[in-house]
């Protein structure tokens, strides 16, 4: 198995070259190692950077799986690592409480480096806090469960609302595929769901580009799409959780995070399927359902998102009318966001401002609309492959999965666009008066 200090770049674009889209993209993660020698290479990295007292951040589970071994390895190299372990085995959230706990500890610490040992929650909490404090951090993944390892944004939950917050990408990633392969199978399924969700995210990005002229980058788009197709084609092997299979999945997830870092937002990897997941997280925070793994939620939502996109974009070339102004929320919509009216209003105001500022780009003829549809065709073409792969990963299409009944699913794909200002197919259908059909 290969050690990747610089993983393959599908675009053949070096990290700081000017792209054909006109931007200069920077991949912040300079070192990515996915190899059975990952912890040895982490220690060598720390020695090169003259670590004396690294702080190792983990939770009760990841401490047992790998964190203690990391501390031992750093100690044997002559360092004096500090241990910060969240005691939770279940239910840890990237919220105000977790941020405060880690921030307080690091402010009082003399640590000269921060190492996050864990998956989604540990990584997001650490990247958010280190960004607040102007510190760097290194990521040591313990599962191929999410795409945020290389990302420069953090998925946080403040006041019960999921928000994408500015943060930093890790300066390096060190992952041992044999550790990743021992993660619970549901975490691997979650990673598959999170990565396959990029299929609908890319259609949403192309749709907004065609309708409103939102900036898009073919290179960044490919950086997500190519690993996505590879994983969709090899889901059965990945579910066997061999080191080779989980390495393939983790590479795809890291590439997705790199793509987000290249454009500075989660747009290449997050569309209405992620908005649905965030909506379900909000319901869980309100006690309306149980929390569920992010990637499983994303994968489940992707089934419905792909169907909506094909319905909206796969028909005849009929030029749509300009979307009607977004009016006051009805009682039904408000009932799903009790206590969060201010946040929802801010999101919708931002979205309306985006639409108003770009209305000149709207396709006013059938021929222009046909170009918009054609622009999404390549992204839409992999929908059958992705839908089949999701089913193989035991992420079904039936109501009841993840404690989500028909009424909640119906509300999700009518109101989840209130969660984020990003334009998606849900906004398109709502603007055309088609969402309730």
PLM segments and residue spans:
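ATP/NTP phosphate-donor binding region
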Residues: 2-113
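C-terminal charged capping/lid subdomain of soluble metabolic enzymes
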Residues: 2-19, 315-437
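Solvent-exposed alpha-helices and their adjacent loops that cap or buttress functional pockets
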Residues: 24-26, 49, 106-109, 130, ...
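N-terminal low-complexity or amphipathic/hydrophobic leaders
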Residues: 36, 49-63, 187-191, 405, ...
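Gly/Ser/Thr-rich loops at beta-strand to alpha-helix junctions
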Residues: 60-66, 118-124, 145, 272
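A short, small-residue-rich loop immediately preceding and capping a beta-strand
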Residues: 106-143
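A glycine/threonine-rich phosphate-anchoring loop and its flanking beta-alpha core
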Residues: 131-230
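A conserved active-site cap/scaffold subdomain adjacent to cofactor or substrate pockets
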Residues: 226-236, 242-311
């Amino acid at each position: 198995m290969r050690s990747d200090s610089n993983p393959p770049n599908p675009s053949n674009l070096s990290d700081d070259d000017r792209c054909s889209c006109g931007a200069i993209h920077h991949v912040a993660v300079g070192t990515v190692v996915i190899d059975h020698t990952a912890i040895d290479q982490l220690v060598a990295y720390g020695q090169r950077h003259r670590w004396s007292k690294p702080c190792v951040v983990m939770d009760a589970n990841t401490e047992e799986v790998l964190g203690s071994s990391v501390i031992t390895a750093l100690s044997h190299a002559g360092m004096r690592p500090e241990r910060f372990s969240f005691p939770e085995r279940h239910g840890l959230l990237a919220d105000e409480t977790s941020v405060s706990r880690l921030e307080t500890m690091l402010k009082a610490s003399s640590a000269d480096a921060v190492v996050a040992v864990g998956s989604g929650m540990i990584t997001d909490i650490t990247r958010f806090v280190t960004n607040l404090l102007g510190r760097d951090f290194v990521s040591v993944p313990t599962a191929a469960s999410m795409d945020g390892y290389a990302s420069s944004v953090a998925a946080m939950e403040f006041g019960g609302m999921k928000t994408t917050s500015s943060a930093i990408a890790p300066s390096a990633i060190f992952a041992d595929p044999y550790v990743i392969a021992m993660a619970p199978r549901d975490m691997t399924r979650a990673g598959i769901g999170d990565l396959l969700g990029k299929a609908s995210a890319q259609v949403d990005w192309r749709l907004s580009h065609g309708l409103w002229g939102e900036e898009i980058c073919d290179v960044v788009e490919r950086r997500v799409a190519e690993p996505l197709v590879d994983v969709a084609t090899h889901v059965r092997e990945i579910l066997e959780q061999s080191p080779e299979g989980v390495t393939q999945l983790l590479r795809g997830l890291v590439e997705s995070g790199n793509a987000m870092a290249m454009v500075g937002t989660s747009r290449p990897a997050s569309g209405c399927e992620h908005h649905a997941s965030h909506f379900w997280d909000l319901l869980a925070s309100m006690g309306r359902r149980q929390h569920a793994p992010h990637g499983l939620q994303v994968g489940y939502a992707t089934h419905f998102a792909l169907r909506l996109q094909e319905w909206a974009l796969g028909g005849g070339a009929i030029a749509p009318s300009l979307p009607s102004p977004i009016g006051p929320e009805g009682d039904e919509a408000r009932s799903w966001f009790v206590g969060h009216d201010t946040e929802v209003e801010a999101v919708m105001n931002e979205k309306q401002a985006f639409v108003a500022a770009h209305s000149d780009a709207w396709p006013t003829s059938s021929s222009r609309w046909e170009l918009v549809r054609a622009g999404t065709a390549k992204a839409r073409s992999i929908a059958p492959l992705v839908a089949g792969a999701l089913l193989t990963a035991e992420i079904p299409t039936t109501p009841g999965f993840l404690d989500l009944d028909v009424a909640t699913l119906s509300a999700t794909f009518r109101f989840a666009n209130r969660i984020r200002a990003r334009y998606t197919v849900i906004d398109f259908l709502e603007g055309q008066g088609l969402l309730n059909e």
